[in-house]
């Protein structure tokens, strides 16, 4: 995924961070900061099988997104990745809470961070 070597049947978390040095894409940082999140029950996610062509689109989006700014934050990154391969598009929003609501509105979502794939992502944190 992106520039991270992901083994078969493995998981990774990918996000942009503005409160780190350097800023930009980090792998598995969310996984490692799970105990610091204020309310993990507010976390929403969807899982899906994807084709090779969709994976290529996702990788291209990740590889061209190693930046962070107020108008290019983690929410914008998540929307770009979602829209690069999703059948359902999400319109622009500026906060994680707004994005959460848009994901909920797409239907068939899950909540929390007890998902085994999320919990089993490697502990290592790697900058893009």
For every predicted segment, state its role.
Residues 42-56:
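A structural motif
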Residues 56-128:
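Activation targets extended, charge/polar-rich intrinsically disordered C-terminal tails
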Residues 29, 33, 53-57, 98:
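Exposed alpha-helical structural elements
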Residues 1-43:
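Glycine-rich catalytic cores of cysteine/serine-nucleophile enzymes that process amide/ester linkages
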């Amino acid at each position: 995924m992106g520039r991270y070597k992901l083994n078969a049947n493995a998981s990774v978390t990918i996000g942009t961070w503005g409160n780190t040095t350097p800023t930009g894409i980090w792998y598995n940082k969310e996984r490692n900061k799970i105990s610091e999140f204020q309310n993990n029950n507010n976390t929403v996610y969807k899982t899906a099988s994807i084709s090779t062509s969709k994976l290529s689109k996702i990788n291209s989006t990740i590889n061209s997104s190693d930046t962070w700014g107020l108008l290019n934050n983690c929410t914008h990154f998540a929307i770009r990745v979602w829209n690069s391969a999703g059948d359902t598009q999400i319109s622009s929003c500026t906060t994680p809470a707004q994005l959460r609501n848009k994901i909920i509105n797409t239907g068939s979502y899950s909540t929390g961070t007890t998902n085994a794939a999320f919990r089993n992502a490697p502990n290592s944190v790697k900058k893009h």
